[in-house]
């Protein structure tokens, strides 16, 4: 068979771009923390990962609102927050009647024409804003926040009466009054962890210790109490002054009467022209509680009110009551404009209020002048306001109903091109859609449809065209229909009586019915989750200082209520910006880019001559993985699909956790690699010449810059040495088989890219020639990079072919969920050179065959359950099909585990990453019950729950690079099943191991708290050591063996119970424990000296069988030699009555 050299497959790992940043004062909202500036977020993160003069990266682990690749908003953990020095231009992007955000020029925004850099935005562009921002819904987190706020020096708290007797021993001498009068400061409560026992509170300065408050207010506990308090807070923010409420509405008064549940009375007082509502019985305590929890201002309320953090940390059921109180007091319904409006002297308050309303999906508008006005308009927003907040004031509630009826439109969605694409895909002419949606034609060109209209359009399109067969016949020329021909000409399907390329493509799509409801789902998700607001102004300014950003898996997050994005080495090689055209996907998926050798020669220029000998490779095939996690998908027969890898390391940041993980994976797969030390342009004073070879560029640098580069390179070389690699700058490497080559580059400006390409090509040819020789005519073998829905094609697979030739009429065998899928290729689609499989700028080229190495998209029936990372084998006979099925099944079965035994549940995004994670767990001795590919489902959680009942530490789900389904999250929260997700394998396992350790310590602490330890004591024989004979008896004792604690029962030699130790005193101090050798006084409740106990008598701590079992099995390490002696002595006593104790 003919053999030839194929192009090498190059994987690019570890690129992280820190160039896209925001000003320090831009705000994000953390569900568990509320609004916080990026600088504040950075200060919150304490563990520094990397730091130098230019930047600092810290571990974060906080949750943020992001947009997933399906267009839906969700909460995701952000692993890092960082700051970088910036000197130069910044842009403030201001959205019309919304917020503004200041970013570096390269920071992208999601617009209706895809992701667009800030410096390419223009007024009138529509930018994405989230419809919803997630706040906290956990009652537990809310209550802990309240307790934190109550740590106030003026707090005086009264505890529940039944607790006082239990804690009296803690308050002796001059502190006994606290228990007697039931008055405690926050330090007392914190020390004894009594927050849950606080019943009533008041506030008085410490300097007035002699004074005491007249009235306390009940600390809210029940939903009813919190709702009454939050409504009152809302009214105060609207109509309140320092001690009264100016409000005429009787309904507000009726609502405020509900404060009686907190022990506060209200009365309505008629003044000359209006009514006032006054608080009595606990007014001062209630107002002070308001100031503490809601940061309510003491003076100049109008200008100084701000939205307090509690409104983002409290569950929505309480926040809605605050908002109702506020809008009842200050809101106005304008029937003329069909809108709700509220005006304030505090612009900042209303700006934050607009973000708070996003917790309910309400998108408002902000009009700024001397006073700021917030407006809620549009049918969808008004309807959500009515559903979640509403008015108690009758005339406002009635006006709202009328405003909703009058309001017919919600936000507009200017997605003209998408609508045309969907219409043609489903086989409609403009005229046909006009009958479903009047004046439809204008929505494709001049007028953006409202949300309601868009939903009607999508519903109509989704039903499909009833005359599709006739249209197919017209395009095929079998039928002549003048109206259709005219419509097709207008849509560009026919020109001069012939089918255009678009017409031919569409005909194929219609014939095969290659469209379904999933084609409209993405647009529907965008409309449900996002709103697009026009850019009003872009202001340019100079800035010197730190800029900030956070890392998320999806490379986007919400800042100042606006969606912002972080994205790429390959962009420079392609001379095209991927982020600019990612309108639909948002996250960067695995892509493949073919670089013909002519392009390499053009970019590398004269450097080729330095490489002695001709480069025979046809080109390079780059696989651009968004991180180490995707590399695990590139598996082929247990090894790596990649022939060579480029590990991108930021020369300024050095090694990151991802870098270490990437190196470990490369080592595991035995993949040769070279290092691209990126961002040399960030070295102070570096002279930049775009696309210049590094060896030319370095000659233009001054000595200081060269020295800094050398220092950073030596730091990298040292790190590689620690990991077992000899590394050096590429031009100093003597033997490429023994030394790791480091190429200093600037991906941003193209410096060093020529050397990188020459090195990749030269090393591949010199050292991998035998591996790259393929049988051209042999059946193809490949690996699935990604399974994805394509408009007009259905489910497709993006595949890297690494051996043989794949033909368009081949039968292929593909790895599926738990089976081998056999299917016939319907279409082979290959991107043009210098483009990406996943998102080509131009339409795919249909090809008859592809020869390795190549990236190809395969359209074929039955691919819905295909697995990323699994093999693809072409088979040309029944025998080959059977052989391929067996090979694929054995590969899947070697990775997918289902033992049914006690062990953890493991889920991963691809077969390769599942293999890597499972291997790591097994090496650490962590048993696996089930390992499978896919998101974490409710079934996974239920299976982990069944494990938890037998062995709690294994009753967990570990997920690598996967999402948690909503129902799975609900069940996990309800049943207490821990779910660990992450995108760094070793970090995921570390987190799990840390949890196991913490759980074991927690369990041990719980056992220690509840178990009774053995102890043997002897009363002193001298009567002088009998301090009281009864109620309680107080006697001096010596601990002979073991230990004693308050609360234990004592027994005699006969086994008879004599009483309970109430307290233990060692000299002048009450203690919680006395051990062997201690001489102490003990108070025994229930015993009388001379009747039940006698001087010189030996007594034993009474133990239950359960105590012994726990001590022997679970707390063996906690037992000292003296405890074991005491246990044996006690067992001897108890064995007289029960034979169980003889075995102890």
UniProtKB/Swiss-Prot annotation:
Q: Name one GO molecular function term.
A: translation initiation factor activity
According to its UniProt record, how is this protein modified after translation?
This protein undergoes a protein self splicing that involves a post-translational excision of the intervening region (intein) followed by peptide ligation.
Disulfide bond positions: none
Q: What keywords appear on the UniProt entry?
A: Autocatalytic cleavage, Endonuclease, GTP-binding, Hydrolase, Initiation factor, Intron homing, Nuclease, Nucleotide-binding, Protein biosynthesis, Protein splicing
- The tr-type G domain, residue ranges: 551-768
Q: What else is known?
A: The intein interrupts the GTP-binding site.
**What protein name applies here?**
Probable translation initiation factor IF-2
Organism source for this protein?
A: Thermococcus kodakarensis (strain ATCC BAA-918 / JCM 12380 / KOD1)
Q: Which gene encodes it?
A: infB
């Amino acid at each position: 068979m003919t053999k030839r050299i194929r192009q090498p497959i190059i994987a690019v790992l570890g690129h992280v771009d820190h160039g896209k940043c925001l000003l320090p004062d831009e705000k994000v909202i953390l569900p568990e923390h509320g609004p916080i500036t990026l600088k504040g977020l950075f200060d919150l993160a304490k563990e520094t990962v990397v730091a130098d003069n230019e930047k600092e990266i810290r571990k974060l682990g906080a949750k943020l609102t992001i947009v997933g690749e399906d267009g839906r908003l969700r909460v995701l953990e952000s692993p890092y927050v960082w700051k970088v020095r910036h000197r130069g231009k910044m842009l403030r992007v201001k959205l019309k009647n919304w917020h503004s955000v200041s970013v570096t020029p390269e920071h992208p925004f999601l617009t209706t024409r895809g992701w667009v850099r800030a410096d390419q935005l223009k007024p009138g562009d529509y930018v994405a804003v989230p419809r919803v921002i997630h706040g906290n819904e956990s009652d537990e987190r809310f209550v802990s926040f309240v307790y934190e706020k109550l740590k106030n020096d003026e707090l005086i708290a009264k505890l529940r009466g039944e607790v006082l007797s239990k804690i009296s021993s803690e308050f002796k001498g001059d502190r006994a009054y606290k228990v007697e009068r039931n008055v405690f400061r926050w330090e007392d409560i914190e020390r004894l962890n009594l927050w849950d026992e606080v019943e009533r509170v008041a506030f008085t300065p410490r300097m007035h210790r002699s004074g005491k408050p007249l009235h306390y207010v009940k600390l809210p506990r029940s939903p009813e109490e919190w709702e009454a308090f939050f409504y009152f807070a809302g009214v105060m923010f609207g109509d309140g002054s320092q001690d009264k409420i100016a409000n005429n509405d009787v309904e507000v008064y009726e609502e405020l009467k509900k404060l009686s549940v907190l022990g506060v009375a209200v009365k309505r007082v008629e003044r000359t022209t209006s009514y006032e509502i006054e608080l009595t019985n606990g007014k001062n305590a209630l107002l002070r509680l308001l100031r503490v929890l809601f940061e309510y201002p003491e003076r100049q309320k109008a200008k100084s009110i701000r939205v307090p953090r509690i409104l983002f940390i409290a569950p929505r059921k309480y926040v809605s009551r605050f908002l109702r109180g506020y809008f009842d007091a200050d809101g106005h319904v304008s029937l003329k404009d069909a809108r709700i409006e509220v005006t304030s002297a505090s612009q900042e308050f209303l700006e934050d209020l607009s973000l708070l309303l996003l917790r309910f999906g309400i998108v408002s508008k902000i009009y700024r002048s001397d006073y700021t006005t917030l407006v809620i308009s549009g049918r969808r927003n008004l309807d959500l306001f009515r559903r979640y907040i509403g008015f108690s004031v009758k005339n406002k509630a009635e006006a709202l109903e009328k405003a909703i009826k009058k309001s017919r439109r919600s936000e507009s969605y200017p997605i003209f091109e998408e609508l045309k694409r969907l219409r043609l895909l489903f086989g409609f002419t403009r005229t046909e859609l006009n009958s479903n949606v009047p004046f439809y034609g204008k929505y494709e060109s001049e007028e953006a449809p409202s949300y309601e209209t868009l939903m009607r359009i999508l519903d109509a399109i989704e039903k499909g065209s009833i005359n599709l067969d006739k249209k197919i016949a017209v395009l095929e020329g079998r039928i002549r229909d003048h109206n259709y021909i005219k419509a097709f000409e207008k849509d560009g399907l026919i020109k001069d009586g012939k089918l255009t390329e678009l017409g031919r493509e569409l005909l194929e799509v219609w014939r095969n019915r290659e469209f379904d409801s999933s084609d409209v789902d993405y647009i529907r998700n965008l409309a449900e989750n996002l709103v697009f607001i026009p850019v009003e102004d872009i202001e340019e300014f100079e800035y010197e200082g730190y800029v900030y950003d956070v890392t998320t898996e999806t490379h986007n997050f919400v800042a100042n209520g606006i969606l912002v994005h972080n994205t790429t080495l390959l962009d420079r090689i392609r001379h095209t910006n991927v982020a600019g055209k990612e309108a639909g996907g948002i996250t960067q998926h695995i892509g493949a880019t073919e670089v013909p050798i002519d392009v390499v020669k053009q970019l590398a220029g004269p450097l080729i001559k330095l490489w002695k000998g001709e480069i025979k490779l046809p080109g390079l095939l780059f696989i651009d993985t968004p991180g180490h996690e995707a590399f695990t998908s590139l598996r082929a027969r247990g090894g790596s699909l990649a022939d060579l890898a480029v590990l991108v390391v930021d020369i300024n940041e050095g090694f990151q956790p991802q870098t270490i993980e990437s190196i470990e994976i490369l080592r595991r797969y035995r993949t040769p690699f070279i290092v691209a030390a990126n961002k040399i342009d960030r070295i102070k004073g570096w002279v930049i010449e775009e696309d210049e070879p590094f060896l030319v560029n370095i000659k233009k640098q001054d000595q200081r810059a060269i020295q800094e580069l050398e220092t950073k390179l030596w730091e990298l070389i040292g790190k590689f040495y620690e990991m077992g690699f000899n590394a050096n700058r590429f031009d100093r490497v003597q033997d490429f088989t023994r030394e790791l080559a480091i190429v200093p580059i600037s991906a941003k400006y193209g410096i060093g890219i020529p050397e990188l390409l020459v090195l990749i090509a030269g090393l591949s040819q010199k050292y991998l020639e035998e591996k790259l020789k393929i049988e051209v005519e042999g059946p193809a073998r490949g690996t699935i990079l990604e399974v994805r829905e394509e408009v007009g094609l259905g489910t497709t697979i993006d595949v890297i072919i690494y051996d043989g030739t794949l033909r368009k009429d081949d039968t292929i065998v593909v790895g599926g969920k738990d089976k081998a899928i056999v299917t016939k290729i319907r279409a082979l689609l290959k991107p043009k050179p210098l483009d990406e499989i996943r998102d080509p700028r131009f339409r795919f080229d249909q090809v008859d065959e592809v020869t390795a190495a190549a990236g190809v998209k395969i359209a074929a029936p039955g691919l819905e359950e295909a697995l990323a990372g699994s093999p693809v084998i072409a088979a040309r006979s029944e025998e080959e099909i059977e052989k391929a099925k067996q090979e694929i099944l054995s590969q899947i079965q070697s990775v997918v585990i289902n033992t049914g035994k006690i062990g953890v549940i493991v889920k991963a995004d691809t077969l390769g990453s599942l293999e890597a994670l499972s291997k790591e767990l097994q090496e650490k001795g962590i048993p696996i019950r089930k390992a499978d590919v896919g998101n974490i489902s409710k079934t996974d959680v239920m299976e982990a729950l069944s494990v938890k009942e037998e062995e709690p530490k294994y009753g967990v789900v570990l997920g690598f690079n996967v999402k948690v389904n909503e129902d799975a999250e609900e069940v996990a929260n309800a049943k207490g099943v821990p779910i660990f997700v992450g995108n760094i394998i070793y970090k995921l396992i570390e987190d799990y191991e840390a949890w196991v350790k913490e759980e074991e310590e927690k369990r041990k602490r719980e056992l220690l708290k509840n178990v009774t330890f053995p102890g043997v004591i002897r009363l002193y024989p001298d009567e002088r050591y009998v301090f009281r004979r009864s109620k309680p008896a107080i006697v001096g004792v010596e601990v002979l063996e073991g230990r004693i604690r308050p609360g234990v029962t004592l027994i005699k030699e006969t086994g008879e119970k004599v009483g309970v130790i109430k307290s233990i005193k060692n000299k002048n101090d009450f203690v919680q424990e006395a051990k062997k050798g201690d001489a102490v006084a003990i108070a025994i409740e229930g015993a009388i000296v001379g009747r039940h106990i006698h001087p010189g008598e030996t007594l034993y701590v009474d133990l239950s069988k359960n105590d012994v079992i726990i001590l022997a099995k679970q707390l063996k390490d906690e037992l000292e030699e003296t405890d074991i002696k005491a246990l044996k002595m006690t067992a001897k006593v108890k064995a007289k009555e029960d034979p169980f104790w003889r075995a102890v």
